[in-house]
Amino acid sequence: MCIRDRCPIPEGAAGVCKVRFVEGGRLHVPWGYVGGVQCDPIEKKPFFHAHPGALAYSFGMLGCDLHCGYCQNWVTSQALRDPRAVVPPTDAAPAALVADATRLGARVLVSTYNEPLITAEWAVEIFRHARAAGLLTAFVSNGNATERVLSYIRPHVDLYKVDLKSFDDRHYRQLGGRLDPILFTIRRLHEMGIWLEIVTLLIPGFNDGEDELKRLTAFVASISPFIPWHVTAFHKDYNMSDPENTTPEMLVRAAAIAREAGLHYVYAGNIPGRVGDLEDTRCHHCAAVLIERYGYLIRSYRLTPSGTCPDCGTAIPGRWSVAFDGQIAATPFLPGTRRLRTV
């Protein structure tokens, strides 16, 4: 199964992702291990319109089809491309992953850390077990997909976050990809009815130009003004140490552009408490505060069981729980450092 276009794999070679290869005339794909697991609030993914406060059990493998110089998960995503990225894989079984997630109280299993599209077969197998156990499923992805892989994962994925890294094809080519496939994926996910949220990591001097942000947010609004768009703060990481870290003022400016483009649900992240109300969810009709946040912490939750505004009755787009059973507490869930025990 081709998970991205323009990636023919000859006999005895690996694809761009470095993890899918052809041997003996057969395509071999990653299976049976994890590069890391962690349990965190779902807001960390981030999903703000899907079961707020729920714990998300995240797992990843190794490898990626892009090579972003600022990758914050480079130890796993670039493990087969960069000799500095050394992560020993841990053998895993789908049933063991789901059991571990259930033990920790997670409600969602998330394929993340590396690029889940290049390990889609493994994720789908885990998601089959997760669904059988009553859990939800999600991808956190660069969105560099084809129709074939989207059709393959569609029956098994509830939530999907796409990193829309830029709206300039030249920038995408620097990262090893192209813009058009990402835009195709965003359109198709929305058409398929998979709950979609989009994130753009705002990098000074790379993708923060006013014109680019206007075009990016206008594109998202043209698909649906109700798609949540998160603009998050860059910090120096991996091979990108030249740009200055993103400031709160930069995030607020980008959010204003998004609102002018017609997006109703715009969020600023990674700098808790310094971006005004851009961490909160407000009703797009009457502007009532529905969910108040500080970082990943839910401070208040006012949505009705049917997912409507309690003040004006407007339906709020998202995937809401019938009853809020997440965390409203003084401190958010603090994950441990343990690694998965497999069977």
Feature map (PLM): residue ranges:
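Auxiliary Fe-S-binding modules of radical SAM enzymes
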Residues: R4-P8, E210-V343
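Conserved AdoMet/S-adenosylmethionine-binding subsite of the radical SAM
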Residues: D91-E249, A254-I257
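Short, cysteine/histidine-rich loop/knuckle motifs that typically chelate Zn2+
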Residues: M1-R6, V16-V19, G63-L66, Y70, ...
